[in-house]
C-alpha cells in the first residue's frame, strides 16, 4: 500500500484519476475542489483521504509487504462474455487544398507585438504597420551560435539578438519581454529558410532551431501573459508554395515546424487568434506588400488556423477527402531493400508484415532498425504459450530479487526488465513472419539519430536501399508552460534528424529511392493539446513527402495516423479511455495495415490520413466526402459555364436519367442579380 502508484506500480496518472472517480462513487464522497492527485501518490494516501472525507481517523497502518510470484491459475470452464466489437470508423483520407475566404473579423489589440526577424525586411515593415494601428512592436533576431544575448535600438525600435538553440539566451529575452504588455507574437524567422534547402543544413539540424526551438522558447516565456489576456495574437509565417507544401517541389520543409507549433498551441490558448500562414514564395520578394498581406490576414480575418496565400491572393485551407486507391497492387521486387526505423515490433512491424504478405516469394529484404538489443534466448520463445512466458517472467523476478541488495523488486523494475525480453521476442516473431512470406529480414540495433552508424549500416547491407519507412518516434505530451526544452528537442530530432540519417544510409548503400513513407500523426495535421513538439516534427515530414512526390525524386507518402488500438503506444494503460473521452476514433491493426499496404503497393502519395472521427481536434470541419465522379462526356459538357451557368456542385447523378446540382446565388458571383 505504500508503493508509489506511478513510480513503483506503473499506474499512470490518467488511470489514477479514473480510480479516484470510482472511489468517490463507491464511498459516496462529496466533490472536493481542493483535491490534488499528485498529493496522493500511494494507496495509503487514497485510504487516508477516504477516511478523512468520511470523518474517520487519518492514520492507516500499512500491512507487511509479502513478495510472492505471480501464479498462473488453472483454467476453469465458465461462460466468457463476448468481447465488445468496436465499429471501424477509420478510413483513408487524401489531404488536398480548398479555397477558404475566411470570416470578416477585425481585431484591435493594445500592447506590444513581438516579431521575429525574417531576413527579407518583412518583419520591420510589419512592425511599422502595427505601430500605425496604435500598437508597439519589438523584433527578435535569431542568430545561431552567437556568444551572448544582446539588445539594442534600431531607429527607435528595440531589437534582441539571441541563439534560438540556447535556452539561456531565450530565457533572457523573455525576461526582458515580460516587462512589457505583450499582446502577441508573430514568428517570421522561418522565412529565412525560404532561400535555403534542407540539404544545406547540418546534422544535427541547426535549421530546426530557427523554425521551432526559438519559437517554442518565446511561447513558453510569454505563456502566462497570454493566458491572462482576453485577446491576443500568435502567428507563424512560412513560404513553401502558398498551400503549405501540398503541390510545390522547391521549398524547405523544415519551415513547417513553426506551423506545427502554432496549430498545437491553438488548443492551449483558444481565446487568442492563431494563424499558421504560408505565403507563396513570390509574395515575400516585395517586403512592403508582403507585410500588408500578412497584416490584413492576421488583423482582419477570422476562422481557420492553417491558411495558405497563393500568388494571386487566394486563401487556401487544407482539407481531407474520403478517397480510396483504385490502382492494382504491385508487389515488391527481388531487388527491393527497405530500411525500416522502429520496424522490429508494434505498428510499423505490423505494417511491414502486411506488405510482405502482399509480396509473396518476392525475395525483397527488410532491414529493421531499433534501439533495443536482441536477447539470444528469446529466439527460442517465438512459439511459446502465455503460460510459458508467465513462468519465465516469474523466474526473472526471482533473479532480480536475488540480485537486489534489499531483497525486493518493484513492479516497475520487474516490468522494465521483462520488457527487454518481450521486445526481443517480438523482433524474432517479426523476422520469422516476414521470412515465411518468401522475403528476407534482418534486425540492426542502432539509434535512428546516429548518422554515422546508419551510414555504416547502409554500406554493410550489400544491397542498394530502394525504400525508407520511418516509423520511429517519441511522444511526451505536456503543455508549453511545463514542457522541458530537452524533451521538446528530442521529440523533434528523432523524427527530423532521424529522416536525414536514413537518407544517409540510402546514399552509402549506393541506392536510389523508389518509395518513401513516414508514419506521422493527426496531431501534425491538425495540432493537439500538449503536442507542440510532436506536431512540429510530423508537420515537417508531411510536407517533405509531398515535396518528394511533386519533384519526381520518388513516390513518397506521409500517413498521419490516429491512435492504433492494442499495439505500440496504444498498449499504455488508459489509452483507449483517453481517446474515447475526447471523441477520437482509434484504428484497428487490421485496418491500419490495410491502409498502409495500399499506400505502399497501390500508388499512394503526398499526405494521407488514417483515421475516423477526431472530436475537438477537428476544430474547423476539415473532412469531406469523396467527390462525385461523372462520366467523362457529361463532365466536359457541364463544365462549360456558358451552357450551364448555375452548376456549382453536382450532388447526384443517374446517367441518362437525372442530375441534381447545387448553386449558391450571390451578387459577387452573379453581378446581373
Residue ranges and their predicted role:
Residues 1-304, 310-315, 322, 328-673:
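4′-phosphopantetheine-dependent carrier domains
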